[in-house]
Amino acid sequence: MTLKVDVKTPAGKTDGSVELPAELFDVEPNIALMHQVVTAQLAAKRQGTHSTKTRGEVSGGGKKPYRQKGTGRARQGSTRAPQFTGGGTVHGPKPRDYSQRTPKKMIAAALRGALSDRARNDRIHAVTELVEGQTPSTKSAKTFLGTLTENKKVLVVIGRTDEVGAKSVRNLPGVHVISPDQLNTYDVLNADDVVFSVEALNAYISANSKEGASV
């Protein structure tokens, strides 16, 4: 089964329709798989530069603070022991790599599941362009997106060369703009609606489907 989505223009008119291949937009979402891929994606974003010093790495504390016996106090060997102010940290974080290895087929399958979920709920839109003309206009882009969906979180997918479109939406709150080769499971699931330019949709379908796109 091939889904069809009307192609909208900034003027509010319908300029034909685009077919969404079932192999990309009509598969059964695997919740566990999408969770695994999103977790790995977020983990890869972590810097992992956190670092604490152990008692052996903290400066100072080389001299025994007081004699072993006869003071009535607990014996201490260094003022850099964890129980002292300014002492080392016990089992504190050290620099590490949080990235997880995720097979490409799993990443692609999770993305297909996420897009299929949005497509089934009529939350995938296709547009000819975001604004008319060659001058960026945030106001016009905001108005146009408002005619497509009332939801606040929108993922906009446009071609890398569409600077006018990118500049028009990049400052809109709740709107995230990416190119088709950057399309990923997290961004799709994090957005309420996904808006493709016809160019970007064709590029994504052509790269991931044997049939390609047809408008």
UniProtKB/Swiss-Prot annotation:
Keywords, in A-Z order: Ribonucleoprotein, Ribosomal protein, RNA-binding, rRNA-binding
GO molecular function: rRNA binding; structural constituent of ribosome
Sequence intervals crossing the membrane: none
Region (Disordered): 43-100
A biological process term (GO) from this entry: translation
GO cellular component term, pick one: ribosome
One Pfam family of this chain: Ribosomal_L4
Domain of life: Bacteria
Function: One of the primary rRNA binding proteins, this protein initially binds near the 5'-end of the 23S rRNA. It is important during the early stages of 50S assembly. It makes multiple contacts with different domains of the 23S rRNA in the assembled 50S subunit and ribosome.
PANTHER family attached to this UniProt entry: 50S RIBOSOMAL PROTEIN L4, LARGE RIBOSOMAL SUBUNIT PROTEIN UL4M
Quaternary assembly: Part of the 50S ribosomal subunit.
Family membership noted in the UniProt record: Belongs to the universal ribosomal protein uL4 family.
Protein name stated in the entry: Large ribosomal subunit protein uL4
Gene name per UniProt: rplD
